[in-house]
């Protein structure tokens, strides 16, 4: 709760938000960075992926994302772009986009945030239904002998 003295004085503390940085580099610098400089900041698995080259499919997705951002009205979210590319690595250019990531059954809408840089799209669209464990069945353990049968 607020202190009564502060409330009486009418002083409102301005909220400060943490400025995002990826490996010590702020977001504006990341957006202006060349691909070669950006790759140096990524972990080894992703550096290897970029060193082996981007194929046609990821480039087509980035092209569609650019188009959706351009066509979106100012201050609005861009239209969702659907994709099956779960192995696509999130780069700074994709921030602010909405992507429908296929999980094998449906397209889960994911809004790309700065904290997602360097992760795969698949990490944000779960492809399985987590197990909800029920009661143990007959023969599960010795103690289950005393559970009455239905």
UniProtKB/Swiss-Prot annotation:
Where does it localize?
Cytoplasm
* A GO BP entry: translation
Cellular component per GO? cytosolic small ribosomal subunit
Matching NCBIfam families: PRK04038.1 (NF003121), uS19_arch (TIGR01025)
Q: State the source organism's domain of life.
A: Eukaryota
Protein name in the entry: Small ribosomal subunit protein uS19y
Q: Which GO terms describe its molecular function?
A: RNA binding; structural constituent of ribosome
The record's Pfam families line, in alphabetical order, gives: Ribosomal_S19
By sequence similarity, the record places it as follows: Belongs to the universal ribosomal protein uS19 family.
Q: Does the keyword Membrane apply?
A: no
The scientific name of the source species is Arabidopsis thaliana (Mouse-ear cress)
From the UniProt record, report the name of the gene that encodes this protein: RPS15C
Q: Which UniProt keywords apply?
A: Cytoplasm, Ribonucleoprotein, Ribosomal protein
